[in-house]
Each structure stands twice: as structure tokens, then as C-alpha cells.
């Protein structure tokens, strides 16, 4: 934490230099309210809720150059933008602890909304092969005011959570710059979420196998899927143990799935090894998108990417 505070201080000192030539900062119209998002999903939700009213706002996403959220290093410009936000929407996990430091060091006066403070967060078990429908007790979800280090950060990958988040964000935006259209747009967007969710009913064998990290626990919970993964959450581990490799290979051998999964930025070498060790053939390696490192310019929205993810699961869960 000391190191992080030193970094924050250094960034603060650098701000005077950074004021010149800042991209998003120079585009902030001081006459408009500003909403700042740290992730792609939040940013897309805000745009859909605002609709045509987006022209009345400065809508900014930091970390829009494709950097993974778990390794993102905030810039001096990020710090200044946060200080100017009327609404700040962020994930709230340990990867964004710097956000808390930024709000404190910049005397943040806006309204902050952390996703993990407005859902039932999932605790990351420190294991590698696990059936994903083991739910924690409500006591384990008491987290407000405490570190989120032990919780899965990828709450946006639950369509059920997305509905709650959008409703909250709509109300929050209305508090800052009232408009009757936010609620209407939000309801229309939630209808689309419900429609998407209703298209996918997985019956029979509901095992999914990830020869990679596993940021999709929230999605698995939505559809009551069993999951087996090489690493829990977005673990920093890079080498799967022999026991993990053996377990994944055994599950592949037993289930004979049409495919096993890796993340959008994942290396498929482990997946190839798992398939080879299983002795099975004609098993596809399928990528799914966690939306945690999407660069500016992405033409697909949250719902389109979630539909692609669910279609990928459907290939295996027939």
C-alpha cells in the first residue's frame, strides 16, 4: 500500500505537466456533467441508459487502450479526470484499489458507484477444479467497508447483476442531471437483457471446462453451470499443477465435450495439453470474452458480446 501511495503522489505531482496535451481531459466540456467509467461494460450501460441525452454529458471511459484491468497503471490524466467526475462508476475489486487512493488524494466530490458494493459478490476459492454451483452462505457476503481482495471482480458477466446495476446507474444519473428518458431507456435495455437470457436454457450435462483462468463464475452462477478451471478467477498463476492438468484431462475424457474454453487473451497451449492427455479428438478450443481489456473503437456492445459468449457455451452444452 505504501508503494501505491507513492505512485499516487508521483502522479499528482506530474499533473501540472500532464495538463498539456491530455486527450480525454481536453474533451471535457465544463458546462456538462461528467460520468467516468473504468470498464467497458459500465461505459456501454451508461450510453444505453442516456440514449440521445448522452450529448448533454461528458461520458468517459478510462483504461480504453486494451490494457487488462488487473495490470492497469493509472495515468496522471486518469487522476485529473476522476477529480472532475460528477459520477464515477468502477468495479471495486482489488485491481482498482488505486481508485480509492485517487478519490482521497484528489478530494473527490462526486458520487461513486462500485459494482461489488451493489451485488452479491462471489468469494474466490483457492482451488482449481470446482463445481460452480456451490453457493456461499449469506454471511460470507458481508463485505461492505472491507477489502474486496478475496472476491471475484467480474460481476458484470452476470446478466442478473447487469439488470441491477443498470437500474442503480439510471437513478444515479437522474440525481445529477434529471431526465425522464433515463428510466425509459433503462427499462428497454433490461427487456433486451431478459430476452437474451431467455434464449439460453442449458439442459443435460452442464459442465464447462476452462483450461485457463476463470473470470466467468458469475455467468456460471446465472445458468447453474458446473465449472472446472485451471486457475481460480484471474489468478496470477501461470503454470497449472500436475493434479490440475490430470483432473481437467479426466473431465474431458469422461464428458467428451465438443469444446473447452479459454479467455479472449488466453494462451491455448494448456488447452491443447489437456485435450492431448485426455486421449479425445475433435475437441474445439473456444474463446470467450470477459470484456476486461477492450480497446476504444469496439463496435459491439455489452449485449452483443454476452450473446457471443452464450452461443459459445451453447456449442458445448447442447
Which residues fall in each region the model found?
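Extracytoplasmic metal-acquisition and chelation regions
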Residues: 9, 19-318
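Sec-dependent bacterial lipoprotein signal peptides
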Residues: 1-20
Amino acid at each position: 500500500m505504501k508503494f501505491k501511495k507513492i505512485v499516487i503522489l508521483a502522479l499528482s505531482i506530474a499533473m501540472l505537466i500532464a495538463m498539456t496535451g491530455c486527450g480525454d481531459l481536453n474533451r471535457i466540456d465544463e458546462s456538462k456533467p461528467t460520468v467516468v467509467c473504468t470498464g467497458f461494460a459500465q461505459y456501454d450501460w451508461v450510453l444505453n441508459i442516456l440514449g440521445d441525452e448522452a450529448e448533454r454529458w461528458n461520458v468517459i471511459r478510462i483504461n480504453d487502450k486494451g490494457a487488462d484491468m488487473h495490470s492497469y497503471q493509472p495515468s496522471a490524466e486518469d487522476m485529473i479526470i476522476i477529480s472532475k467526475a460528477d459520477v464515477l462508476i468502477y468495479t471495486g475489486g482489488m485491481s482498482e484499489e488505486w481508485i480509492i487512493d485517487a478519490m482521497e488524494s484528489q478530494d473527490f466530490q462526486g458520487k461513486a458507484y462500485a459494482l461489488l458494493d451493489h451485488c452479491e459478490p462471489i468469494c474466490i476459492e483457492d482451488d482449481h477444479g470446482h463445481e460452480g454451483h456451490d453457493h456461499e452462505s449469506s454471511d460470507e457476503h458481508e463485505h461492505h467497508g472491507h477489502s474486496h481482495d478475496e472476491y471475484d471482480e467480474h460481476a458484470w458477466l452476470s446478466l442478473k447483476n447487469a439488470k441491477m446495476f443498470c437500474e442503480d446507474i439510471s437513478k444515479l444519473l437522474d440525481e445529477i442531471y434529471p431526465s425522464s428518458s433515463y428510466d425509459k431507456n433503462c427499462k428497454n435495455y433490461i427487456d433486451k437483457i431478459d430476452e437474451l437470457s431467455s434464449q439460453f436454457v442449458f439442459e443435460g450435462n452442464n459442465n464447462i471446462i476452462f483450461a485457463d483462468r476463470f473470470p466467468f463464475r458469475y455467468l456460471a452462477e446465472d445458468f447453474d453451470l458446473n465449472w472446472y478451471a485451471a486457475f481460480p478467477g484471474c489468478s496470477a498463476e501461470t503454470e497449472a499443477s500436475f493434479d490440475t492438468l490430470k483432473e481437467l484431462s479426466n473431465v474431458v475424457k469422461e464428458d467428451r465435450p465438443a469444446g473447452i474454453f479459454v479467455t479472449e487473451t488466453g494462451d491455448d497451449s494448456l488447452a491443447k495439453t489437456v485435450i492431448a492427455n485426455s486421449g479425445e479428438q475433435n475437441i474445439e478450443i473456444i474463446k470467450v470474452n470477459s470484456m476486461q481489456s477492450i480497446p476504444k473503437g469496439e463496435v459491439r456492445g455489452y449485449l452483443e458480446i454476452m450473446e457471443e459468449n452464450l452461443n459459445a457455451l451453447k456449442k458445448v452444452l447442447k
